[in-house]
């Protein structure tokens, strides 16, 4: 027990959005260097809290491998974070990309809690990840850590989970749980891990999704947060808003934020005397050999798989900008149509641009190349929708494009929402007003059609597809089906010129 007026220092170390970057060397992961720094701090002071704000399980080639290729193996990021003795992690929406079974299995092997107060069981409304907060004791000093996830980021993330999981408004859940923590636990210091961003950053970027960057609102309306750890915007920042400190620790373990908090003992409580913060450039530290040894075979397996050749036919499927895909059937989009038909034998197929800045494929194609062309785990769905649904989806994307002198000049849409259809002919007249540009041939707007599209399309256009009938979801991902097509020695790409865009 400390005497009155004595001081105590607590070191808080935080990482963010590490995206399973555990491959070292040319891949540049700094988690092994972070291990060295954390060990140095622990050697100087045993009062250390190591936190991650979420986003550690998905978002890289290595993450894809451990979900799609080797799902039976323990996730290397969990092994690393266990060995580094993380105290808690927030929960990112990206953690749900590969489904609940993967996420639940990964978290079950973690020796630290995953915290999110507003991700709940759909039926009972209890927190999905057990208790959404934890308490760290240093003598009679009590530090509470609670996690919340930006509800705006959770929208459209994974359709499979909706029958099991619901998302409460971040602000509502935060108020309820923080009030509970203060009344029941009476902590000396409260940390909120918020997997969402700062509005002041989002105002200068294209990412302005509602309810995604509410850190300032939480700090202002709750008023009892001592430290807020934010995430998702992939920037490194340290600041103060009224009485609350806030930090964000970049991405991919490139940097680490270190806060040294000095507490002074009062009669029955502790006061914060000072908070010193610094951003740690991890490139200045050597990699921790124990951590490297821990993932040696994991890294070797991913490296071997990534270089496996899928096709050496010398296919030319390069994409030189969005215009290549939205103005005519491109060999790359034809490959997507051919692949998705392996799942369900429907005449009508809908595919979308796999990623912003899509480059396509060319030459010798390895697993790594295919991942970079189609990095997301989209899965085909068999459904019945109306002709009007088809028109509405096409109208949406072409209403957000503009052409000048036959060149695409303006894109005010996430490129992955641009869809390409086959199974009927259609024409886009960019000279018409938005919402009146699409003409469908052989499609009756009042009739229903059996269609194959990805779960990504379904989630993001669900407001148009409220009356859709879902028949079946396919187990394998689009990239797996694409690889199957590319490996077929008899496969030849033959483009179906079924749509035209008038942009003069």
Give names to the regions the model predicted.
Residues 14-21, 313-322, 464:
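Acidic/histidine-rich, surface-exposed loop or edge segments in extracytoplasmic proteins
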Residues 136, 288, 438:
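Short aromatic-centered micro-motifs
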Residues 71, 202-212, 294-297, 304-305, ...:
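Charged, glycine/proline-rich intrinsically disordered loops and linkers
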Residues 2-284, 327, 331-339, 472-477:
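Acidic, metal/ion-coordinating pockets
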Residues 9-11, 21, 27-35, 110-118, ...:
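Feature captures C-terminal
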Residues 6-7, 263-365, 486-504:
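A short C-terminal boundary segment appended to hydrolase-like catalytic domains
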Residues 162, 324, 378:
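Conserved short-loop catalytic and cofactor-binding motifs
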